Structure formats: structure tokens, C-alpha cells
């Protein structure tokens, strides 16, 4: 017993001695760190020798001696020593033992300290086991149990030892004993009770596995799977979904549908469908409007119940609605084989088609408008039960009177080749207009406006309530027998098809390469403007209809071999020739009502002389818009002016500046070219 008592007392003294040494070392290290920090802050480590102070780049040279990963606050010999960092354990003696393991004396002290501490802890375990297993047992039995447990824990000691860095020579497995000393803090306070005096290593390993808390990885995966299940229920897939249009009781507009197949249900506006094959649903009982479709083969609704608008198709094979009960507006179709609506009970608007073989519809019981066709093989309507009148007008300013339920006036036509109309029982007139100024046709029951017709060859209507006008090289068309309100828009280079069997008012607006119109019916229909067009406002009300022409002053659309038209807001100079025209390439944006894109004339634009040769803006005169060729030219890049020398003039007094020689002066003031007299006048205003 005395031997055991000495064992318990001796480690206490060594423990206190080692603790004092560890505390002293920590204080010394702390002071050294402070010294090094101050050493770096005052840059004294750079100025080592007087000769080094003379070199202004010495600090940079010193820094280049070190690698980027080196710690500058340590000594060179300390940098090369690998340090083992263990974040799992934080006791003072363990850190001191690992950091100072090169010192044999300190290592020996740490080993003796750990061995004595281990003996003390084992004596504590032994006393616990004595009280539990053999309360009345002898010391020899306790000793045997202690030896058995020590030998039994040897496999665990090897297992724990693998967690540490490899020990240096002379290191007597103190790290594993240190870890066993800390096991009561990690494990439950009472060690597991062995089932036999000598327990097997497998049983101890099994107990260790049971004592250790569960791994955090399993818990994390369980939480992640639970979160994934919860989130997967609240996540909606909104990508790559085919959209369908909603139904509403009032007008809706759908803009810019590209490469899509859409269907419209009620009161919807479909704007500018590009490269699409749309099918519009039928069964509409109220007014519909079909808007311009571009590069499309469109089929419009049948038996519609609400208002629909389908944009005007360009280069389209178009079929319009049949058996409609509401009003419809069909805008002009360019390069289209159009088929118009049949047997509609209320007012409809049908637009002209360009380069189309039209078919005329017969047996109409209501008011209809047929527009003139340009370059068209028209078919005229026959079997007319109402009065018709045939007027031949040659180079005449005629006025045609129509005896319908509402009187109509057809105003001045100038230089006209008339088309004849036959078998008329009542007043109907078909007007052929060539090189005509515009006119407005208004009926008493419903006012009608007839837009300007330019360069038109008319065709006659035969034996039908509807007039079919054939126009060759024509902008305009004539308005025909209608009991109510009708508007007929200008058509240029169009072969339209006209649809009959309407019981109510119909509006047929042909808008091809034209200033297009926006048609608004009694049931609020919107007809969108066509691209490459100047819009004219077309409004259908119960009383009066106004068809406004927004063409340029000459009411003239310049023709291009490539089919391009001049749609600029204003021209920079005189009217373009037929050979060279300015073309504005517009983006494929959805056209809005009254939409017109203003493009500045200073950008490089493409113009076409022939179909196979393009000329850029620099090859064209800025003022006269003719090719520059090999003549003398004036180029001012800052003002983006490139013109003939004969066209170069003072923009104030219009004095030609073509005879300028070396040394002559021109003045540019506020982006405007001034000759010397004009600029001197401006200079005089500055001087008081």
C-alpha cells in the first residue's frame, strides 16, 4: 500500500513542475511574437547594414528572396522545421510535447509526466473496478484486473495512435496514453464494465463504437434528404412550356409571338406573328379583327363569338373566318393568297392580298366594300339583285352618284381610265382611277372615306351588289355599294380576293406597301399597322368613318425592284429615282397603332441599284442621292457628308462651294456649313 501511495504522490510533484515549465514557455513565445511583430512594423529588418540603406530598392530585393508562402515573422531555421498541428486536443502538455519533440530532455520529462498521470488514472479505474466487481477482493485480484484491462486496451492504443503524426525515436507512445487519460471527458464518466476478468479486444472495439456519438455525416444526409423532399413539392417547372391563350370577355392583345402556333379564344388581339402557322379558334359571335401576319400561313377562326384581331400576314397563304356573327377586320396581306370570310352576319373587314389570284364571293345580302386590285386577275360577282350603274371615265373629273339606301358621293378623279359596269338595276358605280388625286366617299347612313388612288387601272363590277375593282399599277381603289358604313384602303401591286355573303357592314382595307390604317369598329377592334407602311387611321363607327391618308406630299410610294419602299419619316433631299431608292431596314418589332420608326439619315444604309448589286451609303451623294461615280466629290467625315462637288453648298445662303481651291476657307458652326460671308455675319453678332 505504501508503494501505491508513493506512486500517487510522485506524479503530483512532476505534474506541477511540468506545468510551470509549460507556462514559462508560453510566455516566452508570446514575447517573441510581439518582438517579431514590432520588428516588421518599423521596417528595421530591412536596414541591416549602412551600405544597404543607400540602395533604394533594397527592400524589394529582400522581399524577392522569400517565397510567397514563407512566413516573414519566423526565423529561417524555424521555417524549415515541419510543425505538427493537432486541433483535436488542446491541453498544454500535449502541445508542448509535440512542438518541442526535438529536445530529448523535454521529451523525457513529458514521457515521465504522462506515464505517471496514466498510472494515477489507471489507479482510479482500478479502484472503481474493485468497488464494482469485487467489493471484498484482495489487492492481487485488483492488480490482475488492472493488468488485464491494460493489455486489453492495447489494440485501442494502436488504433488511436494512427491519428497522430509518426512519433520520433525515443517517443514511448505517450500520445496514446495521453488520449486515454482524456477519454473520461469524451466518453461517459463511468467506463464500461467488462463481462469477464479478461475481455477480448473485439469486445472493447465494439464498446468504443457504441460509446462514440453518431457521425455527423449521417445526420447531415438525413436532413438534406428531408429538405429535398420538402422543396421538391414546392418547385414548379416553368421551362419549355407551350402557352395557351386565356379567354376574356373584353379585348386582349398578344404581342410578338415568334415561331409559335397559337390559338385565340375570345376578344383577343394577336400582333405580328413571325414565321408561324397560327390557327385561330372559331365560334365568335361578336366583332373580330385580323391583324397583319408576316411570313405566315394563317387560318382564322370560324363561328367566332368575340372580337379577335389577327395581324396582317406578309407572304402568307391566308384563309379568313367563315360563318361569323361579329364584325371582323382583316388587314392587308402582302404577297398572299388570301381567302376572305363567307356568310358573316355582321360587319367584317377584309384586306387586300398582293400577288394573289382572288376569288369573288356572291350572293351578298348586306353592305360590303370591295377594294381595287393591282396586277390582279379578278373575278367579278354576278347575279345581282340590286341596281348597278356603269360609268366610263376617260381623262375625266367625274362624279358618280349612287342610289343606295344611303346616298354616296364619289369625288374628283383626274386622268382616269374607267372600267365599265354592266346589268345595273339601281345606282352602283365602279371607278377606275389612273393617276388620281385622293377622294373621300361618304354615305348618308354611314359616312365612307375613299383614300387617294395613284396610277390605277380600274376594273368593272358585273351583276352583283358588290363591286370588284381591278387596278393595275394602282395605289387606290373605289368603294362599292354598301347600305352601311364601309372603308376601302389603298392597294398597291395587289391581287386581292373579296368575300361576300355578309349580312351586315363590312370593311375591306387593302394595305400593301402603303400607309396603313387602323380600323376600329363598333365593338372596339384594333387593326395594327403594317410594316414598311405609313399608317392611315381608319375608324368605323355607327355613323361616320374617316379614312385618313398619311402618305407623303406627293401621295407617292417609290417603287423598288426588290420590293422595298421608302418609309422614312422625311427625305433628306429630292424625290428618289426609280433606280436608286433609300431603303430602311426595320427590325422585326411588333407594329403598334400609328407606329412609325424614325431613322436618322446619317447612318450607313443599303440602297439597291439592281437586284444583284448593292451600293453603300458612301457611294451615294448626301444631297442629290445619286451615285458619286468618278466625279469630283467632297467628303466631310465629321459631318458624315459625302457629295458631289457641285452639290456642296453653304447651308445658310445656298451659295455653291464647288470652286474651292487650296487656301479657301469654309466654316462649320453648330454642325452647319457656312461660307465665309455667312460666318462673318455670325461673328459680327458676337462683337458688341
From Swiss-Prot:
Cellular component, GO, one term: cytoplasm
Listed Low complexity bias regions: 140-154
Amino acid composition bias (Pro residues), ranges on this chain: 186-195
LIM zinc-binding domain mapped to chain residues: 619-685
Sequence segments annotated as region (Disordered): 1-29, 134-231, 340-373
Basic and acidic residues: compositionally biased ranges: 358-373
Transmembrane keyword on record: no
Cited Gene3D superfamilies: Cysteine Rich Protein
Free-text tissue specificity from the UniProt record: Highly expressed in esophagus. It is also expressed in keratinocytes, amniotic tissue, foreskin stratum spinosum and stratum granulosum, hair follicle and nail.
Gene Ontology MF: a single term: metal ion binding
Keyword terms: Acetylation, Cytoplasm, LIM domain, Membrane, Metal-binding, Phosphoprotein, Repeat, Zinc
Compositional bias (Polar residues): 1-25
Places the protein is found: Cytoplasm; Membrane
SMART domains documented for this protein: LIM
PROSITE patterns found in the cross-reference section: LIM_DOMAIN_1, LIM_DOMAIN_2
Modification N6-acetyllysine, positions: 83
Sequence repeat copies, ranges: 251-266, 267-286, 287-306, 307-326, 327-346, 347-366, 367-386, 387-406, 407-426, 427-446, 447-465, 466-484, 485-504, 505-523, 524-543, 544-563
PTM sites of type Phosphoserine: 289, 389
InterPro entries, per the entry: Cell_Prolif/Cornif_Regul (IPR052621), Znf_LIM (IPR001781)
Role: May function in the assembly or regulation of proteins in the cornified envelope. The LIM domain may be involved in homotypic or heterotypic associations and may function to localize sciellin to the cornified envelope.
PANTHER family the UniProt entry points to: SCIELLIN, ZNF185
Record's protein name: Sciellin
Organism: Homo sapiens
Taxonomic lineage from the root: Eukaryota, Metazoa, Chordata, Craniata, Vertebrata
Amino acid at each position: 500500500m505504501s508503494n501505491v501511495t508513493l506512486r500517487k504522490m510522485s506524479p503530483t510533484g512532476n505534474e506541477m513542475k511540468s506545468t510551470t515549465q509549460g507556462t514559462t514557455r508560453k510566455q516566452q513565445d508570446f514575447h517573441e511574437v510581439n518582438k517579431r511583430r514590432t520588428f516588421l512594423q518599423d521596417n528595421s529588418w530591412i536596414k541591416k547594414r549602412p551600405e544597404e540603406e543607400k540602395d533604394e530598392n533594397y527592400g524589394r530585393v529582400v522581399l524577392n528572396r522569400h517565397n510567397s508562402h514563407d512566413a516573414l515573422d519566423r526565423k529561417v531555421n524555424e521555417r524549415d522545421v515541419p510543425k505538427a498541428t493537432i486541433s483535436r486536443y488542446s491541453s498544454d502538455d500535449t502541445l508542448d510535447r509535440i512542438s518541442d519533440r526535438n529536445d530529448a530532455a523535454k521529451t523525457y520529462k513529458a514521457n515521465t509526466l504522462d506515464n505517471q498521470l496514466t498510472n494515477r488514472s489507471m489507479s482510479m479505474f482500478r479502484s472503481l473496478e474493485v468497488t464494482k466487481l469485487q467489493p471484498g477482493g484482495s489487492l492481487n485480484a485488483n492488480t490482475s484486473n488492472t493488468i488485464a484491462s491494460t493489455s486489453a486496451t492495447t489494440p485501442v492504443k494502436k488504433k488511436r495512435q494512427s491519428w497522430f503524426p509518426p512519433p520520433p525515436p525515443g517517443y514511448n507512445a505517450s500520445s496514446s496514453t495521453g488520449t486515454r487519460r482524456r477519454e473520461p471527458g469524451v466518453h461517459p464518466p463511468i467506463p464500461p464494465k467488462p463481462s469477464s476478468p479478461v475481455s477480448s479486444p473485439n469486445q472493447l472495439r465494439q464498446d468504443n463504437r457504441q460509446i462514440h456519438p453518431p457521425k455527423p455525416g449521417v445526420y447531415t444526409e438525413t436532413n438534406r434528404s428531408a429538405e429535398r423532399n420538402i422543396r421538391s413539392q414546392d418547385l414548379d417547372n416553368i421551362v419549355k412550356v407551350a402557352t395557351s391563350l386565356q379567354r376574356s370577355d373584353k379585348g386582349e392583345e398578344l404581342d410578338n409571338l415568334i415561331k409559335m402556333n397559337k390559338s385565340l379564344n375570345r376578344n383577343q388581339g394577336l400582333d405580328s406573328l413571325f414565321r408561324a402557322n397560327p390557327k385561330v379558334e372559331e365560334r365568335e359571335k361578336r366583332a373580330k379583327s385580323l391583324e397583319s401576319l408576316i411570313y405566315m400561313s394563317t387560318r382564322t377562326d370560324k363561328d367566332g363569338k368575340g372580337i379577335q384581331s389577327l395581324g396582317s400576314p406578309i407572304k402568307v397563304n391566308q384563309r379568313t373566318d367563315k360563318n361569323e356573327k361579329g364584325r371582323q377586320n382583316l388587314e392587308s396581306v402582302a404577297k398572299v393568297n388570301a381567302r376572305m370570310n363567307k356568310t358573316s352576319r355582321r360587319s367584317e373587314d377584309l384586306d387586300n392580298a398582293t400577288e394573289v389570284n382572288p376569288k369573288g364571293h356572291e350572293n351578298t345580302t348586306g353592305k360590303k366594300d370591295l377594294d381595287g386590285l393591282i396586277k390582279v386577275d379578278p373575278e367579278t360577282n354576278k347575279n345581282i339583285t340590286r341596281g348597278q350603274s356603269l360609268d366610263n371615265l376617260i381623262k375625266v373629273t367625274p362624279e358618280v352618284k349612287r342610289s343606295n339606301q344611303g346616298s354616296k358621293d364619289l369625288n374628283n378623279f383626274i386622268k382616269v381610265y374607267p372600267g365599265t359596269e354592266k346589268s345595273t338595276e339601281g345606282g352602283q358605280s365602279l371607278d377606275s382611277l389612273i393617276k388620281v388625286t385622293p377622294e373621300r366617299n361618304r354615305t348618308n347612313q354611314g359616312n365612307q372615306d375613299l383614300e387617294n388612288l395613284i396610277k390605277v387601272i380600274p376594273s368593272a363590277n358585273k351583276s352583283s351588289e358588290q363591286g370588284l375593282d381591278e387596278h393595275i399599277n394602282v395605289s387606290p381603289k373605289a368603294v362599292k355599294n354598301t347600305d352601311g358604313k364601309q372603308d376601302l384602303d389603298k392597294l398597291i401591286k395587289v391581287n386581292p380576293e373579296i368575300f361576300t355573303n355578309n349580312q351586315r357592314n363590312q370593311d375591306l382595307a387593302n394595305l400593301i406597301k402603303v400607309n396603313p390604317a387602323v380600323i376600329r369598329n363598333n365593338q372596339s377592334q384594333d387593326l395594327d399597322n403594317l410594316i414598311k407602311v405609313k399608317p392611315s387611321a381608319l375608324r368605323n363607327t355607327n355613323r361616320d368613318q374617316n379614312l385618313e391618308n398619311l402618305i407623303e406630299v406627293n401621295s407617292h410610294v417609290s417603287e423598288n425592284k426588290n420590293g422595298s419602299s421608302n418609309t422614312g419619316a422625311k427625305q433628306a433631299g429630292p424625290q428618289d429615282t426609280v433606280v436608286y431608292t433609300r431603303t430602311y431596314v426595320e427590325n422585326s418589332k411588333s407594329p403598334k397603332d400609328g407606329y412609325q420608326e424614325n431613322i436618322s439619315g446619317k447612318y450607313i444604309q443599303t440602297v439597291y441599284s439592281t437586284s444583284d448589286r448593292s451600293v453603300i451609303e458612301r457611294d451615294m451623294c448626301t444631297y442629290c442621292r445619286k451615285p458619286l461615280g468618278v466625279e469630283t466629290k467632297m467628303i466631310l467625315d465629321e459631318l458624315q457628308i459625302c457629295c458631289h462637288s457641285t452639290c456642296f453648298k453653304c447651308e445658310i445662303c445656298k451659295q455653291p462651294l464647288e470652286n474651292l481651291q487650296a487656301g479657301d476657307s469654309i466654316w462649320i458652326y453648330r454642325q452647319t456649313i457656312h461660307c465665309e460671308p455667312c460666318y462673318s455675319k455670325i461673328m459680327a453678332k458676337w462683337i458688341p
